[in-house]
Every structure is written in structure tokens, then in C-alpha cells.
Amino acid sequence: MKKFQTMGELIAYMVGANAPNELKAEAENQMQAVEEVNQGGATAYLIIAESKAEAKQVENEYALSNCAPEYSRIINTLDGAYWKQSVFVFSDDGGGIIYFERVPLLP
């Protein structure tokens, strides 16, 4: 699981991971919201889970099985991967996570 609070951290990761352009663009766009929330005094993260094990870690750490996302959608990338983007808000001040989870392809 990768957890980011700044655009610089995210960009460094995306370049090193050779992430698909579609994921980069959406994650960078969402990172702006994370930075705004953090500047306002709340705590927010952008989280990327690339495997089932990382997804399970995020689910356990944030008790995601006990809450529903405010927003969720699937991002298709040109390399054939699917990413599920979900937004979870945990507090009235906007604190929460924007979560990107790699969705395994069906056999």
C-alpha cells in the first residue's frame, strides 16, 4: 500500500512505478483535493493498492467493510488494467481517503 499526502510524493512514485497515463492523470487530479483538505486542517491521504494483499491491508486499516464510499468508479487503462477509484470521508471536516485499487482481470 502506498500512502501520499503531497503531489511531490505522488509524482515521484508514479514516475518510478511507470504508472499508466490514465491512472497518473486521475491520481494527480485527486491529489489536489487531498492537499486542499490537509491545508484546511483535516487529514486526508491518497492511497494506491496494487495487489490483493495491499487492498486487504487498506480494508483492515480503515475498516472499509463497515462503510460505503461517497463516490466510486472504474478507470480503464490502455495497458488493459482496471483501477477502482473510491472516496471515503471519515469526518465532518473532510478528512478521509481517496483510494485507487487495482482490480484483477477476470480469467
For each of these PLM feature ranges, what is it?
Residues 21-105:
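Acidic, low-complexity, intrinsically disordered interaction modules
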Residues 2-16, 35, 104:
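Short, extreme N-terminal segment that most often corresponds to the first beta-strand
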